[in-house]
Amino acid sequence: MKKVRFGIFHLVSLALMCITATNMCAESKAEKQEDIQKVAQQTLQQLYQAQPLAKTAIEKSAGYAVFSDLGIKILFGGTGNGQGVVVNNDTKQKTYMKMVELQAGLGFGISKFRNVFVFKTKAAMNSFINSGWQFGGQATAGVKTADSGGAMQGAVAVDKDVWMYQLTEKGLNVSVTVTGAKYYKDDSLN
């Protein structure tokens, strides 16, 4: 039993080191910002191909955020982290942020996904940026609302005036799960 615990500890430690190493590839602040922006643009293009009306929803919003996340789950728990950028549509100002996630439950594997948040109001966007936003739970439905004209189809409401699209390597994910996730400013990039 001690060998199993020791092995699990080493697997989790290795997984955390791998996640940390992926975020340290770029050397300078400008290179890191450029890498995040490049991933954000690729993610938006992937989203627009999967859900063309998302482009209109994002353009008409107060702003949006794009995060690239990597999660690892081993037996009874998992962890993940990521980074991204929030873009204010009025000012074009970019705020770089990080994400950490904790999961409980049985499982084993590595998951890569990207989240695109759409902020209907400036207040919702500023709250996300400044409050170290965090949430837990599961949302599983994209809906058509009267004020969005179907533009949010494939997205899930995760907070008041905040919608989220989640993309995997296979495309748009209709079932979105975020458990114990926290988003916060990346002081080293802002």
Mark where each language-model region is.
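Small-residue-enriched, tightly packed secondary-structure blocks
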Residues: 27-190
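Bacterial N-terminal signal peptides that target proteins for export
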Residues: 2-12
